[in-house]
Amino acid sequence: MNTLVLKIDAILSKHLKKQLAPYTISSQNTYVAFAAKKNGVTVLLYKSGKLVLQGNGANALAQELNLPVAKTVFEASNNSQDIPIIGSDEVGNGSYFGGIAVVASFVDPKDHSFLKKLGVDDSKKLSDKTIQQIAPLLEKQIPHQSLLLSPKKYNELVGKSKPYNAISIKVALHNQAIFLLLQKGIQPKQIVIDAFTSQSNYEKHLKKEKNHFPDPLTFQEKAESHYLAVAVSSIIARNLFLDNLDQLGQDLGYQLPSGAGSASDKVASQLLAAYGMSSLEYSAKLHFANTHKAQALLTK
């Protein structure tokens, strides 16, 4: 996905709205004054006058609309790394045991040499041992904001008749991590989120959150493989998740597996037999199918 960001005046804004009137779409972002989608490209005009075009045909649409795309205008492709970027990623949402760790990190081009020397990459490609070695160095060097939602708190917030579902809770966590990082005075040229839902769905859930920021977002699938800032967040978040999983296991006297496979079913059934449902409320995400599978194992 390509992203174009530029500043336009009131006259050009009015002309743009007229040109794209047949392609208007709704946006839940309170900072967006006008939104449209044409030829697969999403166009967002912010109240500040910032215009964002997102999609593989962003350049072509900009030319069609006669937009002033100068050399100074930022153009980001999947592997663009030459600007200051905030990248956000989460770990733990697919694991029955453990909480959800969300991290937003700010990477400046001057950090690239340091990151490449460390061998920073998508945390999914790195061993847990390597992650546990690299993460403390990243935490010390790279401005970031970490959030950890414990399983106990997760179960209070997520589920039937609860305030959040599995998607909206991640929207809330990503938004808060980025918001808090921006509050530290960070000034990125781009904010990238590893896409876990569509932009429209993200903005729908975002509407009920208290904290907001005007900066436009880029949603990129497998962003940790394309942006160093997201890769950094992925590593720090993975380490935070692993530490939490280990601590929960120590508290209960069991080694808790990552993931949501049969190993999780087995350990969950053992916890149920030893301590009852309260142990899973403390250590696991109850709405996962593993809970019922663990209960079924007890009856065999």
Curated annotation (Swiss-Prot):
Cytoplasm is among the record's keywords: yes
Domain RNase H type-2 intervals: 83-300
Catalyzed reactions per annotation: Endonucleolytic cleavage to 5'-phosphomonoester
Binding site for a divalent metal cation: 89-90, 194
Xref: Gene3D superfamilies: Ribonuclease H-like superfamily/Ribonuclease H, TATA-Binding Protein
Regions that span the bilayer: none
PROSITE patterns for the chain: RNASE_H_2 (PS51975)
Biological process annotations from GO: DNA replication, removal of RNA primer; mismatch repair
UniProt cofactor note: Manganese or magnesium. Binds 1 divalent metal ion per monomer in the absence of substrate. May bind a second metal ion after substrate binding.
Entry keywords, A to Z: Cytoplasm, Endonuclease, Hydrolase, Magnesium, Metal-binding, Nuclease
Coiled-coil region(s): none
Protein localization: Cytoplasm
Protein's name in the database: Ribonuclease HIII
